[in-house]
Amino acid sequence: MSTTVKSRQRVIEHGEVLTPQHIVNAMLDLVEPETERIDSRFLEPACGTGNFLIAILERKLRVVEARYRKSQIEYERYAVLAVSSLYGIDILADNVEECRHRLFQAFDAAYTRLFGKKAKAQCREAVRFILRRNIIHGDALSLKTVTDPPQPILFSEWSLVNGSLLKRRDFAFHELVSHSAMRELPLFSDQGEEVFIPEPVKDYPPVHFLEVAHAYDD
């Protein structure tokens, strides 16, 4: 049985309580269609060791497998997209590392089971790189990284374009959650109304999804 705390001291200092798996699943069942949409994005602002994100990834990967298991390149493309749709922030460095590791293991277990020795190192490297970008050591309250000095949290948006090309755009977290911007304009509108569209702080040219680990300076 999984524990809900790592240590009493961590609860006192950081309010850390881990969500039990049965509660995670019950909560995700409330938004089941979104958890099964491969490109639907999720952010966990206090991700801990990744219980929510892993459960979402496992659901997405089941969809990817059902649709694309007969084609390795198609499976790889959409499995990478599924991983790239998940974001997390945690104030504790060991949680961040464990969350990245567990997400990678969830991906790799499914990938290896399907393709065995045909699994590509490039695909694994792409997933590791994306997880380093998407799971951030930071403070969701201050909207900054836990570094010296702190820096604004940046998130990378990943989108498939023209088949196997992956487009990256970086956004400042504080812009995405700006109360003034959110009050002035909604994020989405089905009535053709003007909406709030955040501006990226950096826009990158598309690259093949298997090349992302070596396509950027970071």
Put a short name on every predicted segment:
Residues 2-218:
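SAM-dependent methyltransferase catalytic region
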